[in-house]
Amino acid sequence: MKIKTNYANTPVWREINVKSRIPESLKMLEVMARNIWWAWNDDATEMFRELDPELWRAVGQNPVALLERLNYEKLEALSVDKEMLGKINAIYDRFTEYMSVKPDKNRPSVAYFCMEYGLTHVLKIYSGGLGILAGDYLKEASDSNVDMCGIGFLYRYGYFTQSLSMDGQQIANYEAQNFGSLPLERVKDENDQPMVLDVPYLNYYVHAYVWRVNVGRVPLYLLDTDNEMNSEFDRSITHQLYGGDWENRLKQEILLGIGGVLLLKKLGIKKDVYHCNEGHAALCNVQRLCDYVESGMSFDEALEVVRASSLYTVHTPVPAGHDYFDEGLFGKYMGGYPQRMGISWQDLMDLGRINPGDPNERFCMSTFACNTCQEVNGVSWLHGKVSQEMFSGIWKGYFPEENHVGYVTNGVHFPTWCASEWKALYNKYFDKNFMHDQSNPKIWERIYNVPDEEIWKTRVALKNKLINYIRDQFRDTWLKNQRDPSRVVSLMDKINPNALLIGFARRFATYKGAHLLFTDLDRLAKIVNNPDYPVQFLFAGKAHPHDGAGQGLIKKIIEISNRPEFLGKIIFLENYDMKLARRLVSGVDIWMNTPTRPLEASGTSGEKALMNGVVNFSVLDGWWLEGYREGAGWALTEKRTYQNQEHQDQLDAATIYSILETEILPLYYARNKKGYSEGWIKTIKNSIAQVAPHYTMKRQLDDYFAKFYGKEAERFHALEANNYEQVKKLAAWKEEVAAKWDEIQVVSFNKCQDLCNGNVESGKDYKLTCVVDEKGLDDAIGIEQVVTYTNAEGREYIYAVNPMKMVKREGNLFTFEMIAGLSNAGSFKVAYRMFPKNDALPHRQDFCYVRWFNE
């Protein structure tokens, strides 16, 4: 027999998953790993790291993945390590004590809808500021014991991981998440099977798995369509954050809004207030309207109930930033809903239009949110004003400054963003109840009692940690992107821990103003190469994959950073995420922000830096317009000198250079014998004492309750009392007023001759009398005089609104009188308007019928 030289069959491989078998004495580690609580409790994070520091780094600081990969011998050794067990048990006791506290039932309950949540870098379901804010919000809701739940998506690929080519080109890498190794859990049905939510899309259903993230005491429910029950196209609905075309975006928003409400029903969850964090979630009110109509209400009655319990928070300052959908596309998926709500297709479209009845106007989610939510708010004082202007077309008859759009300035979750070194310092010198009273300025003023030297040592320690982190984490990246390793070594050597370190990190959109620093490269080169005042800049940030201008800006900065005069002085760090952000906001000396005014709705990165003794240098826009105090940071004025943006940029750049050269650098380097600048430490103390207490997430959450949640919940419960008796009355009253509105007549209107001629004297009062035929309505009309003036830019503003008093009634005739005058001389315009009035209305824009008259 001839022996073959090679004789083997093909192996039959079977994939098996081997998970760590956790000893009983370490079971509490699994419980804590599955709750995001560890992400803002440093001792818990450190506990997981100590289990296996090398593996902790290898798994990207993910405790779930860490426990899965710990080998059995390591686990057995830990299970008998008395010192480690003592530490684990102490932290677990604190965790269980925290979790045992029940929600405060004296405060309204809230359902919170958002497209993204930034909870930890481990869970890639966020892209930027909106998500970070939402994540911070849920964490603070947990810390503040609020009855809240979140609704969002579990993205298979999340937002992209950024890498940069040798020439600075951004490369977007989408890496699939392994859900089994993330800090979340499947929601099961009554048969202990994975829960499936069926969401109607006109002629078919999309099927979503449901996951739960435990954010301390707050549950966050995430929908996931990437399963075999769906078509290939529908599986991709939850593949990428803001991914795909406009059709996919609409599918996402249907799933978030309509699917989110269906999920709450399936889970048996009912809340007092439904909070749409951005317009992406606005369609939640479509499903809520359907539910109330199908329970027996008319559409108008259902709208009263839904509106009374809904809040819309807008985050964009420009109309182009809102989502608009063509009628054909919108009808493809939403065509069946009008019938369920008892209205026409035109009625539904008009709820999303500024100009109802205009067939050329697309459906806008933000307009729909404004029309179906009682309250609307921006995210800073200035953004509130910008939003009043932006949405003014929805409420015709009122000037922008009159409408009900309010604001709550964004804050940051202190335990998440404050470095452990600063927490230790605050705990040492502040009140023991500091964490429960973060918004109390008196407590923060105790920073003035902290020795200067201790603050300086804290700052130096964190700066060195950042520099070491950069050297460790980014050496491989730089080697990959540079042909010459010696150049990388040279770059590393040029990073100077004693230099003033300025950070600029955010989403790279052109309006964020990263280009300003590079307006005059010769002047910038002189600044960064001054041997007496060394300074270095750290940049980080991602540009949207479809934003060519933003990507071009990144490329330009990297090209400049590779020039000999800027090598090691300007550094761009790739893949900006929460992990890198925490290092930057605690490690740099100055946090710079230079957005185009007034396009920064709020901005919170500077607030995070503030908590870590980092001084802000920013345009007076967003939160810094409110936060800036002289001696507590530096600012560029909020006022534009030029309408031409290029000229304004040149002026702003020159101002930045000048402030750096004449104020910031001399102050930083005015060192005493102990090696630090007393003036610099004073600036740090001022910023912490005078600014920090006003920008915590605790303050933000309390503001939402004080300004919106409380009054909405109170009104909602009043409306639903006695089988919705008030709802029925109010809807009937509105219907009657609407039916008779065009018939109401101004029978007579008597003004003095001076007013008729348009010539009046300041300080002199005039009497006006107006008789109105209300056509059978019962004192349902208000009359007022509106006085306006025009400023130097040609913008018309309200000078005064003077109500006329109803003094007599004869049948349907109501007589109104007013005695008023103008105290200031000048040129004004005067007109009169009537409007429906009812104490049951939350504000005028809730029933926006207005008729102007002057004769």
Residue ranges and their predicted role:
Residues M1-E855:
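Catalytic cores of carbohydrate-active enzymes across secretory and cytosolic contexts
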